[in-house]
Amino acid sequence: MSEMDEAARRQAIREENRNLRYLRFMVDLALMEIRSGGLTLAQAGKIVENLRRQALALFPGKETAFDLIYRPRFQRAIAETYQLH
């Protein structure tokens, strides 16, 4: 692997790590907002869908990953906050 290829690979890894940190921050922020109870159920659902779109913009083609990793957390937070048991 050439030095240029290695530098490009390191840059791509840095960018992916930055995107992942940003996504984690946005997920945590959305969960806090949902758990605050100040939103309607419809607004909470809209936040989740908007965040999913943002996640897919950062990580195209990773719909399944979002649905497996983050959607259950949001469903649990919504169920607990809005007492949907």
Predicted regions and their residues:
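Helix-rich interaction surfaces within compact, conserved domain-sized segments
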Residues: 50, 55-85
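N-terminal acidic leader/helix
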Residues: 4-41
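Short linear, low-complexity motifs centered on an aromatic residue
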Residues: 13, 41-56
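Residue-identity detector for glycine
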Residues: 37-38, 45, 61
